Amino acid sequence: MKLFVCFLLLAVVVVSAVNASEEMRLKNLLKAVERDETPDECVTRGNFCATPEVHGDWCCGSLKCVSNSCR
């Protein structure tokens, strides 16, 4: 009986550790996706989006690159 309880406790610890590492990996992936603000090529206008640090807005009215002030 003690062996079964020890095995069950060990299984809970292993599953919890795997779950925590997977959750951390997904959080880091989400942060990387949210942090990626690289402008993509404009579809409507056919030119590249402006750099937000230099030009402010990217490409207002295009299908891909729209900054917050353009929405």
UniProtKB/Swiss-Prot annotation:
Disulfide bond residue pairs: C42-C60, C49-C65, C59-C70
Arranged from A to Z, the UniProt key words for this protein are: Disulfide bond, Ion channel impairing toxin, Knottin, Neurotoxin, Secreted, Signal, Toxin
Asked if the keyword Amino-acid biosynthesis belongs to this entry, the reply reads no
**Where is this protein found?**
Secreted
Highest taxon of the source?
Eukaryota
User: Which residues constitute the signal peptide according to the record?
Assistant: 1-20
Give one GO term, molecular function aspect. Answer: ion channel regulator activity
Tissue note: Expressed by the venom gland.
Identify the GO cellular component terms for this protein: extracellular region
**Keyword Secreted in record:** yes
Q: Which residues make up the pro-peptide?
A: 21-35
| Note, other | Negative results: does not show activity on 45 human receptors from 9 families (5-hydroxytryptamine, adrenergic, dopamine, muscarinic, histamine, neurotransmitter, opioid, sigma, and gaba(A) receptors).
Q: What is recorded about the domains?
A: The presence of a 'disulfide through disulfide knot' structurally defines this protein as a knottin.
What does the UniProt function comment say about this protein?
Probable insect neurotoxin with ion channel impairing activity. Does not show activity on 45 human receptors from 9 families (5-hydroxytryptamine, adrenergic, dopamine, muscarinic, histamine, neurotransmitter, opioid, sigma, and gaba(A) receptors). In vivo, does not cause paralytic or lethal activity when injected into sheep blowflies or crickets. It is noteworthy that both sheep blowflies and crickets are evolutionarily distant from prey species.
Q: What is this protein called?
A: U5-scytotoxin-Sth1a
Query: What is the species listed in this Swiss-Prot or TrEMBL entry?
Result: Scytodes thoracica
